[in-house]
Swiss-Prot record:
Alphabetical list of Pfam families matching this protein: Chor_lyase
InterPro entries documented for this protein: Chorismate--pyruvate_lyase, Chorismate_lyase_/UTRA_dom_sf
GO cellular component labels: cytosol
Family assignment from sequence similarity: Belongs to the UbiC family.
Pathway(s) of this molecule: Cofactor biosynthesis; ubiquinone biosynthesis
Organism listed in the record: Coxiella burnetii (strain RSA 493 / Nine Mile phase I)
Paired cysteines (S-S): none
EC number: 4.1.3.40
Signal peptide: none
Protein name, UniProt field: Probable chorismate pyruvate-lyase
Keywords: Cytoplasm, Lyase, Pyruvate, Ubiquinone biosynthesis
Biological processes per GO annotation: pyruvate biosynthetic process; ubiquinone biosynthetic process
Compartment(s) where it occurs, according to its Swiss-Prot or TrEMBL record: Cytoplasm
Top-level taxonomy: Bacteria, Pseudomonadati, Pseudomonadota, Gammaproteobacteria, Legionellales
Annotated catalysed reactions: chorismate = 4-hydroxybenzoate + pyruvate
Length: 185
């Protein structure tokens, strides 16, 4: 199978790279949080692994239009269905977005960011981009426990609070695709 080694919009991803179930999950335009909860009848668990001001990786700074060594709030999370990792996530929120008047992003705490983004009309979402995560990509760290040579897909999109961006990246475990079905939309 040919590797997709760069971020690309859906129309540039060969249709043969995804099964129908993978396509359904990866291209889902709504709240992934809500879809995961619905699919598992609320049994999925959201875990905040880390929330810290740190330097984003190069591809994140470029996409967000911030300069190195500017720090941003980085949130790393995972969604587990019982013990099975289904989705790992990384959110990068530049300081200017956090500091914007009225921003609800300053005190997210243990909550899922999706509960905030899709409940507030001041947030808009940019286009989704996709890529395969290989061992040399910085996001591989989040899924190395389950990779085992599997094809790992990720998606990312910019959200905007008014005009200020934040980046949401989601890495999908093969277990999600195996343990769920297209009918669980």
């Amino acid at each position: 199978m040919k590797k997709q080694l760069f971020w690309a919009p859906q129309n540039e991803i060969p249709s043969t790279l995804w099964t129908a179930n993978e396509r359904s999950w990866l291209t889902h335009p709504g709240s992934l949080t809500q879809r995961l909860r619905k699919t598992t009848d609320g049994q999925i668990q959201h875990h905040l692994l880390r929330e810290v001001f740190d330097a984003p990786v190069d591809e994140e700074t470029q996409l967000l239009g911030i300069s190195q060594p500017e720090l941003a709030l980085i949130r790393e999370i995972e969604w587990r269905y019982f013990e099975s990792l289904w989705v790992a996530g990384r959110v990068v929120i530049p300081k200017k977005t956090l500091e914007r008047e009225g921003s609800p992003l300053n005190h997210i705490g243990e909550r899922s960011l999706g509960d905030i983004l899709f409940a507030n009309a001041k947030f808009t979402r940019g286009d989704l981009e996709f890529r395969q995560i290989t061992a040399d990509h910085p996001y591989y760290f989040y899924v190395k426990e389950i990779a085992n040579g599997s094809c790992i897909w990720a998606r990312r999109s910019l959200f905007y609070f008014e005009r200020d961006p934040l980046l949401v990246s989601e890495i999908f475990s093969p277990a999600l695709f195996l343990e769920s079905s297209v009918s669980n939309d």
